[in-house]
Amino acid sequence: MAIPKDMRLKGHRTFNYIHKNSMTYHGKLMTFKVARSNPEILLTHKLTNTSNNFRVAIAISKKVSKKAVERNKLRRILQEWLLTNIQKINNHKPYWLLVNLKFGDFRNDKSKLLEEFQNLMFKSRLIK
């Protein structure tokens, strides 16, 4: 199941803001960029819901896999984890999260991918 629209990050201005104003957390398989939310940037993209909630974007480059099917599977795995653990996410401080998967062969090892994703969520204090 996909992430709800009010939890998605879109637009180049949003990503530029995250790259400039974020804390970066590195893992072996992925990096997290966590920034304070800024709803004013969302207004420039004509989004109807500009609430100050937790939002996320998952970016998987072609270096990870040339096949879009495999990249989408990885994205769906991470989105599924987010949706099942949404109650654990720290909502009293609104953040934007950008997840970048690094180059590596982890397509066959779903548990390793999810373990590192959860560890980085704890490390970035998005989950208590």
UniProtKB/Swiss-Prot annotation:
Keywords: Endonuclease, Hydrolase, Nuclease, RNA-binding, tRNA processing. Gene3D superfamilies: 3.30.230.10. The keyword tRNA processing applies. Consists of a catalytic RNA component (M1 or rnpB) and a protein subunit. PANTHER family: RIBONUCLEASE P PROTEIN COMPONENT. RNaseP catalyzes the removal of the 5'-leader sequence from pre-tRNA to produce the mature 5'-terminus. It can also cleave other RNA substrates such as 4.5S RNA. The protein component plays an auxiliary but essential role in vivo by binding to the 5'-leader sequence and broadening the substrate specificity of the ribozyme. This is Ribonuclease P protein component. It comes from Prochlorococcus marinus (strain AS9601).
